Amino acid sequence: MHVIDVDVRLYMSTFIIIDQSTENTSIDTTVTINIIYLAIMKIIMNIIMMIMIELV
């Protein structure tokens, strides 16, 4: 579970950086949504991997 924790913190910090840059350049919201979607997918994959390791 600790690995996922670190991952989530990493993603949160990238979101903050994205937020600051988008305010100035006003990039399409779809781009931001895609980035968030990818981050969520990565976290879900990590959780699945952790569960698989636990089962094996």
Swiss-Prot record:
GO annotations of cellular component type: host cell membrane; membrane
Membrane association type: Single-pass membrane protein
Regions crossing the membrane: 33-53
Subcellular location as annotated: Host membrane
UniProtKB keywords: Host membrane, Membrane, Transmembrane, Transmembrane helix
Superkingdom of origin: Viruses
Main localization of the protein described in the UniProt heading: host cell
Annotated protein name in UniProt: Uncharacterized protein VACWR201
Species name: Vaccinia virus (strain Western Reserve)
